[in-house]
């Protein structure tokens, strides 16, 4: 295992699922998990890494069930966007309590709650060492927060999209259901598509591929994993062009 004294990345986009904030709870935000994540992000800032964050909203709102019951998909997606803003507010607060400067930018205007998304300002804030949290997805219905993560990652010229999940990488099958599942250390975009591996939704994944944006999948619930990832140590699964 190689340990580089310097970080492997200068600027990253960290994608966290809303579910990751739940901890062992079935719903909502576990304050202990939130504070631990804020501390891990703080470590990156102290290493001189510029950090953008996109958080999902699945811990607070899931639109699929309501859509099946007849709710308009656009309405459901708007509710989902607001859930990501709530998570973003919680993360910004946790970072501030950890003495980390952070700004929350929303793709839909919410005057008095958070800033409107502004590309030039986001870049400027990142360069000045502030963590920038991007909320409300892309601002459009029918787009996942994985799509938002890839889009924002490409826009801010991040070197990698780090996708924090509940498993420690990409497997040949669901490791929770199949103990024979094999973990991959590195994959090409083509291999992921050919093997039909579940990394993120197709629209998000092809956007990353088309713009040569590497994706690194790791377990955000594993203490220290995020730091190991940015230091270039063997952690998670890296997906990039071969």
From Swiss-Prot:
Gene3D superfamilies: Acetylglutamate kinase-like. Catalyzes the reversible phosphorylation of UMP to UDP. Belongs to the UMP kinase family. It catalyses: UMP + ATP = UDP + ADP. Pfam families: AA_kinase (PF00696). GO terms for cellular component: cytosol. NCBIfam families: pyrH_bact. Its main location: cytoplasm. The gene is pyrH. Residues 23-28 are annotated as: Involved in allosteric activation by GTP. It is an enzyme of class 2 (transferase). Pathway: Pyrimidine metabolism; CTP biosynthesis via de novo pathway; UDP from UMP (UMPK route): step 1/1. Its EC number is 2.7.4.22. UMP binds at residues 57, 77, 138-145. ATP binds at residues 15-18, 58, 62, 165, 171, 174. This is Uridylate kinase. Coiled coil: none annotated. It is found in: Cytoplasm. Keywords: Allosteric enzyme, ATP-binding, Cytoplasm, Kinase, Nucleotide-binding, Pyrimidine biosynthesis, Transferase. Allosterically activated by GTP. Inhibited by UTP.
